[in-house]
Amino acid sequence: EFRRVLFRSAGIVEVDGKPVMMDNGQQLEYFPLELKLNLTGSSYVKTAGARMAKYEVDRTSHSDGRQPDNDIVLFRYADALLMKSEAKVRNGEDGSLELNEVRGRVGMPYREATLENILKERLLELVWEGWRRQDMVRFGVYHKSYDQRVQLADEKNGYTTVFPIPQKSIDLNPKLKQNVGYK
């Protein structure tokens, strides 16, 4: 279940007005200007920075709510539909049916299935699920610079988008060559 939480600098509340409580029983307060790289020992260790609560935690399974019985989401049907839409588009087919099934679930209007539209939809639908970097690499936009960001020299040869091939694999198959940037 998607849960929206209102962020402001006073006490944090859920959409229904219920206060969000910290583990010490106090209402959570958001201190956006107190964000630091090292919060160790700071009173803001638990209150700095924004939070995302995408899935409801089963707080009734244990008295402290720390060991919920509900399962974590690993793969979602919407992700499978977006993958199918992408595969169709990459094969020269129309992937609009799958893309718009995802969009229709939340009342969004029809959109043509293009790689650009699919990437945008993956950003919106799969936010905070850990797929964005790999999506950007796969769609070839990971290296595109954005405002205020300097492009690193190593990015031009792909060093920052691929992982090293394990040495054991190279030893087993002499035809494998290590990816550029790794020794």
Model-derived features: positions:
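Structural register within alpha-helical repeat arrays
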Residues: 77, 84-86
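Structural motif corresponding to the intra-repeat A-B loop/turn of tetratricopeptide repeats
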Residues: 89-91
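A generic secondary-structure boundary signal that marks alpha-helix termini
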Residues: 86-87, 127
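Flexible, polar/acidic helix-loop-strand segments at domain edges
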Residues: 3-76
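Long, intrinsically disordered, low-complexity segments
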Residues: 64-67, 71-74, 103, 108-183
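A generic alpha-helix propensity feature with a strong bias for hydrophobic helices
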Residues: 22, 35, 78, 167-169, ...
